Structure formats: C-alpha cells, structure tokens
Amino acid sequence: MRLSRYFLPVLKENPSEAQIVSHRYMLRAGMIKQQAAGIYSWLPLGFKVLKRIEQIVHEEQIRAGHIPLLMPTLQPADLWRESGRYDDYGEEMLRITDRHKRDMLYGPTNEEMITDIFRSHVSSYKDLPLTLYHIQWKFRDEIRPRFGVMRGREFLMKDGYNFDLDYESAIHAYNRHMVSYLRTYERMGLQAIPMRAASGPIGGDNTHEFLVLASTGESEVFYDAAITDLKFGDRVVNYDDRAECEAIVKEWTAPYARTDETHDEAVFGQIPEERRRSSRGIEVGQIFYFGTKYSEPMGANVVTADGSRVPVHMGSHGIGVSRLLGAIIEASHDDKGIIWPEGVTPFHAGIVNLKQGDSSTDLACEALYRDLSARGLEPLYDDRDERAGAKFATMDLIGLPWRITVGPRGISAGKVELTNRRTGESEEMSSGAAVDRLAQIYAGI
C-alpha cells in the first residue's frame, strides 16, 4: 500500500478524552473514531489489525478441532426467559421491541441461542463431542464506557461452546480450550496468564480468566512470579489426547495465579516472598465449565447408548478480539507510539523514501515494494512529499515492526537501512538482503 493513497488520519496532539496509552495511540494513529459513548468505527489501519487478530483466533480454533458458524447479533428474548437469565442480566442488556411488539435483545453473549441450535439438530450421543464457535459483535450497555476499545459498549468477541456427554469429556473440552488460548495469545506476542476467577452472570463451577499484566488493567491480580517464566513455544499438541492437554493445563495452573475475587491470602502466603506478586491485569479471555446450567432448563438432551435421555454438559469460552488491540498496545509501546508484534502488525514493514522525486531513490523504493510484495509481504510505502522527520514520526506512531529507509547517499553505495522498531537497532545492507531478512522473519511467524 502506498501511503499517498491510504486513508490514515493521524493526529499530532494527544486527544484530551483519552486516559490510557492504548486509547490515545489508537486515536492518534487513525485506527478508530468514536461515534457514541463506547461505540467506534474501525478505520482502515485499525481494521487491518482487527482482521489479523481474528485470523489467528480462527486458525487456532480450527487447529483445536472447533467448528465455526455465525449467529445473529439480535436474539429473541424468549430464549433468555427460558434459561431464566432475561430478568437476571440487568441494565447492561440492550432490550428491543420490533414492529410486531416482540421482545428482542442485542446479544451480550450466546449461550441460549447456541443451546437452541444444538437441541434442534442433535439428539444422539453419537454426535458428541461437539464444539461450535463464532466471532461476532456483542453489546453490553456499560454504565461508564471508557478506555477506548478496552471497555466499550460494542465489542467483537470470539465465543465458543462445547457439548459433551459427561463431566470428564466436558473437562477435556475445558482443558483443550485453555491450551488453544495459550497458543493463540503467544502468537500475538502476548503473555496472557490463566487465573482462577469468579464466573459472574454466565455461571458455572470452574472458570479461568486470561489476563495481560498492565498498570492500566481493571482487575487486581495476585500471582507467583514463576508463571511468567512459562512459554508455550512451538510445541505440537494432539488436542484429542486428554492426558497431554491435562498435563499442559497443570503446568500453567500449578503456580498460584488468581483474580481478587478468588484470592486466598493464606495460600498466597505460602509462596516464597521473593516470588509473590500483586499487579493489575487486562482480561482478554475467559473459559467456563457450567455443566447442565443451560441444557437442563432448555431441554438440550441426547439419547445415550442405553436409551436414556440426559442433558449435555456444556462450557463457554470467550476471547475479546477487539479488546486485544488495546491490550497489545498497553503491553507494547514507547513514548513515540505503538510497537506491533510481528504476528498482528497491519503491514509487515514500512518503506521510507528520504527524497521523494529523486530518480534513484524512487526506483529503489519501487523495487523494494515490488520485491517484498512478491515474497508475500505487505509493505507500507511512504511516498508522500514530506520531511524525513514527519515520515519517521508517522512510522514510529503506527508501530510497524520494521522500517526500510532509502536515501540518495545509501543508494549510491548500494545500501538501504533496516531498522527494528522495538530495539531501535539499524543495519545497512543491500535491498535484496533486506527483503530476504524480512521474508525469513515472517516465515517463522
């Protein structure tokens, strides 16, 4: 993409309404525009990152054997009355009446609707286990929306639902989701720690939240520092192997890690003092096992091998897709702007032409743009007639992991400058070497 043809409405000054770094940089970098309290339009740069995150989530869900579908944002209220949650949910739920005076709602979550889909089409234990998921916009009418996409009213979420014959199978689904989530977040350059948490309005006996440590997080968390040394890495997982998934879950849940709702000071005090930590965290996902909480009242039953009918065991599992943008920025920025991890960057590298209109630099930039694109990479070429300082400031603000700087002096020596945004380190090399280096880096992502 050529920046001269791209829609990137960057702001020079910090917006007064932005209280935290991620909100400030998302507005300044032209990623979002607020349309109402807690409701945003996603502008091209922000939308690209959103789609990168969504793609990683899809890939890891499918890797784990989960099946995508798509449910509507509007739901009939009768489903929620059937489960008993319609009156319990409170004023966060946006309730709507259509022209036929039927009660509807803008879904804050989808347990009732997915249970209705299941009971309409599945009746035998032979069709189990089954896990369905979708990525869809949700709405919760927060009383005080703030912090940009971190606590908006409308948000994009991946929510998945498992249906199993018995408790043991449902716990395997729970473990499978935890393993899948660990891999998902690490691919995004995040360390998201699974912490024992409260189940809230969704309910259930077993739940973990995934939290990214950040001073701007809304959750108070307590943990053993040993958990921050764990890395999922590139291990290959057989998601059908119950023992393997259980072992990974034990590895990640053995160190103490809890939110304030479930914190146990007595247990925490048994950890060596030098490893005890308290901090703030940003919730980016949560997994639940809630047994027959929805299947029993809604009649989601299957016929077993002996002919009896039993309610299925269920769980739900969410990832805050749009919130993840804010969490990544909170965890990865400096005083110049965003620093995108390579896995979610909107463009793989920026090309800065220091002397637009100079034939040698123009030709070199065009060749770089063409060669990077031919290797399957997406460069952002700053071909604007602007000062070098302004171009560098834009690149630093939008946070592309790599920048290739092309100037007359370097081109005369057959060199360009490749700069790492995170470290600030620069290296001169040929254009071909720069293309090869970037292709190699992204081949491993």
UniProtKB/Swiss-Prot annotation:
It is an enzyme of class 6 (ligase). GO terms for molecular function: ATP binding; proline-tRNA ligase activity. It is found in: Cytoplasm. InterPro entries: aa-tRNA-synt_IIb, aa-tRNA-synth_II, aa-tRNA-synth_II/BPL/LPL, Anticodon-bd, Anticodon-bd_dom_sf, Pro-tRNA-ligase_IIa, Pro-tRNA_synthetase, Prolyl-tRNA_ligase_IIa_type2. GO terms for cellular component: cytosol. It holds the Pfam family tRNA-synt_2b. Keywords: Aminoacyl-tRNA synthetase, ATP-binding, Cytoplasm, Ligase, Nucleotide-binding, Protein biosynthesis. Belongs to the class-II aminoacyl-tRNA synthetase family. ProS type 2 subfamily. This is Proline--tRNA ligase. It comes from Cereibacter sphaeroides (strain ATCC 17023 / DSM 158 / JCM 6121 / CCUG 31486 / LMG 2827 / NBRC 12203 / NCIMB 8253 / ATH 2.4.1.).
